[in-house]
Amino acid sequence: MKITDIKATPVAVPLKPSKTKSKMRKGPNAVIAVIVQVFTDEGYMGIGETPAVLGLDLSSAIVNSAKPILVGEDCANINLLMKRLYVQYNANHLHIHTASWAFSGIELALWDIMAQKAGMPLYQ
């Protein structure tokens, strides 16, 4: 089963205003994340999420830049694919911790595809 496409969609989910009486910290007003979708040639679509601790634009850009490395590859080789991503980002002198946030959504989407194909819930 080959990967045909990867999409990253930035989202911001508004939170209810904080009820704290503290004037120092009111808390965040939204949860920001990037939803990752991985598509296959057999019609499966895996969904993952990565926290956008780097900001929505950078997280989305890292996910989208993984597309040339992953498209056409067998999505069952999750460990190999993730290793390729990490090697590529190390070669480009990017801090691997930075990229690992974005890669978590890709890996989760790949495991989601494998769970769907096996007819099992993802947690198993």
Predicted segments, located by residue:
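Short, intrinsically disordered, charge-balanced linker/junction segments flanking boundaries
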Residues: 120-124
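Metal- or metallocofactor-binding catalytic centers and their adjacent structured scaffolds
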Residues: 39-117
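Structured beta-strand/loop patches that form or line metal/cofactor-binding pockets in enzymes
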Residues: 1-42, 51
